[in-house]
Amino acid sequence: GDGEYLVRVGTENRQHVMGHISLLGYGGRIIAPMTTGGSNESALGDPIEILLTEWARQCHKQGGLVILPHFPNPRLESAAAIVGGEIDGVEMTSWGDLYSGINPYSLSDWYRYLNCGYMVAAVGGTDKMTAMTAVGTVRTYAQMDKDQAFDYQAWMDAVRAGRTFATYGPLIEFAVDGRPMGSRIAMSATGGTVDVVWQAASVTVPMSRVELIVNGEIRESVAVDAANASGHWSLRVDKSAWLALLVRGHYPDRPEIVAAHSTPVMVDVEGSPFQAAADAVTILEQIEGAMAYLDT
């Protein structure tokens, strides 16, 4: 890098059923094998000799950042990796379709973990496989600490802290009681009211709506100017909740898309753990399915 732009090469290690995993910014020797357990990702008949969680632990040991790319597919081991605290972020993408925005399938599965209290940052990634999509179509923006130098380590620290949003164009600021994205706010058992402040601007995808997502549901929604908007809401919180900002937009003569999404702020109310029975059952079933696949 030259001080304004930094480029760092990482790897996407793969197992065609257990999942893919992006290992970024680590030092030392390359984390191998990069593929295992064929047939689509490795040699035909190749046994599974390493798991996603093992790749993730080695990356963390070598100082790197661990991302689940094109989340949630392939999905089998991602549940165990997230629950085990091995994942720093999940990648929102549209699988090559510039005009479809952040895929709702990615969002709904990410929401499942947030609903159970697992705070994992949102990141954006193009997953460019063809000439149909330009590099950087969907991006990650991470807010670094003001006292940190502009370097890759500072960027990784910001992603780990969840000070991120994924976007197809709109830039957003979002704070809950003055706390940035990725924060955790502790409340007494009586709950309380939080002040939500936001701002959004776009010179690419025209914006149409800004929404406040609370525990996976739309709590507030407002139509906005295509280029610039701001606002605030006061929200009563009686049980533990996560709050995030979602920006919708659309290109001319195209359907509305999810154009940007923040990492949430988690509000922990004393005596009210994050609970979502249906989501928890699905996560457990996925972990059990991964174990069954390995056993057979």
Which residue stretches match the model-derived regions?
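Catalytic cores of extracellular degradative/oxidative enzymes
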Residues: 1-122, 126, 132
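C-terminal functional module detector
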Residues: 76, 116-121, 126-296
